[in-house]
Curated annotation (Swiss-Prot):
It comes from Pasteurella multocida (strain Pm70). Residues 49-169, 188-294 form the CMP/dCMP-type deaminase domain. Zn(2+) binds at H103, C130, C133. Binds 1 zinc ion. It comes from the Bacteria. This is Cytidine deaminase. Homodimer.
Length: 294
């Protein structure tokens, strides 16, 4: 990851800004986020607004992309309510279903979610959001005020891209993606990876199917990455927990080759994600999915 990011630095107009961000990311082992106080410091030093700074950093966000199919690298930055930046990038997985793909806006928002962000105010992206992503972003409580910023056009409300939008309220749902959630699932274990998967299943946003699942990925150096299921009112833009967890791992500067264990805990109701998850795990790593049904 460090080499991919290093190659993008020349795309940032100010080389002083590029070097400042390089040193920050290097110090945090290339975790793809910037705390609000770091954003404030960079904005002050380089005389930029948070939105202007994010636009300049999009090449770095896009460096986290995995696009073996399209070779089309999209970068996004979700800005949290206190001003933190959460990078995101499109993730494609060859030799499996195209539905396993993660879009850059989904990546940035789910990355924010796994870092316990509770509200997104702005999404900055290097290409116009596709319809899939517009619908995904409409699952946020902040959707009516959410601003989209592109290199060629800034300060656009999400609903200017999604007029007469269909969303959670149309299905009488008042609970939104990123809202605190406890699905009250229980499982007796002292295993920290299983406990993390259970915690993620309890945090899943699935008000439509009420089918909850969570993923925990353990690496060879004992890091644990999290993924909760993010359901959508339009169903198809929903994001499975495995993709959320893989995204969390990659945006944390880690690698697929470092994975040694994947645990999935699921309370299936109208839906079951087990086989979809097993297919992607078998495609990516030489380990079985550790699946627990509640």
């Amino acid at each position: 990851m460090s080499e991919k990011i290093r190659k993008t630095l020349s795309l940032i107009e100010s080389q002083q800004l590029a070097q400042d961000v390089w040193h920050i990311l290097q110090e945090q082992h290339f975790k793809g986020m910037l705390p609000y106080f770091t954003v404030e410091h960079l904005c002050t030093k380089h005389q930029l607004t948070p939105q202007q700074l994010a636009l300049k950093l999009l090449p770095i966000a896009a460096a986290y992309s995995l696009a073996p199919i399209s070779q089309f690298h999209v970068g996004a930055i979700a800005i949290g309510q206190r001003g933190a930046y959460y990078f995101g990038a499109n993730l494609e997985f060859a030799s499996t279903h195209i539905q396993q793909t993660v879009h850059a806006e989904q990546s940035a928002i789910s990355h924010a979610w796994m870092n316990h962000e509770s509200a997104i105010t702005d999404v900055v992206v290097n290409y116009t959001p596709c319809g899939h992503c517009r619908q995904f972003m409409n699952e946020l409580k902040t959707a009516p005020q959410l601003k989209i910023h592109l290199p060629h056009s800034q300060n656009n409300l999400l609903h200017s891209y999604l007029p007469d939008a269909f969303g959670p309220a149309d299905l009488d749902i008042q609970h939104f993606l990123l809202d605190a959630q406890n699905n009250q699932l229980t499982y007796e274990t002292q295993d920290p990876v299983m406990l993390t998967a259970l915690e993620c299943a309890n945090a899943a946003h699935a008000p439509y199917s009420k089918s909850y699942h969570g993923i925990a990925i353990e690496t060879k150096d004992k890091q644990i990455y999290r993924g909760s299921y993010a359901e959508n009112a339009a169903f198809n833009p929903s994001l499975p927990a495995l993709q959320v967890a893989l995204n969390h791992l990659l945006l944390s500067g880690d690698t697929l080759q470092n994975i040694q264990r994947i645990v999935m805990i699921e309370k299936a109701n109208h839906l079951c994600y087990r086989h979809m998850a097993e297919d992607l795990v078998a495609n990516l790593v030489d380990i079985p999915l550790d699946y627990i049904a509640l």
